[in-house]
Amino acid sequence: MSLADAEPVFYDEAALTLQDHDHGEERWVIMGADAKGRILVVAYTYRDPNFVRIISTRLASKNERRQYLEV
């Protein structure tokens, strides 16, 4: 997955966003559709109010896809 794959997820109006409390820094996880219609899970953090640093991007699991589609 590339940065280009992850960017559309942030514009998906149906995206699900949760805070990830398992790390020392404030991290977030967003699940949404990319430009190809794939459901991706993107972990990220804010470096300042206008800068998002993507930590990882991956395809959603079967259970995660189901969760996204149910909302």
Predicted features, each with a name:
Residues M1-V71:
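Ribonuclease/tRNase effector modules and their secretory precursors
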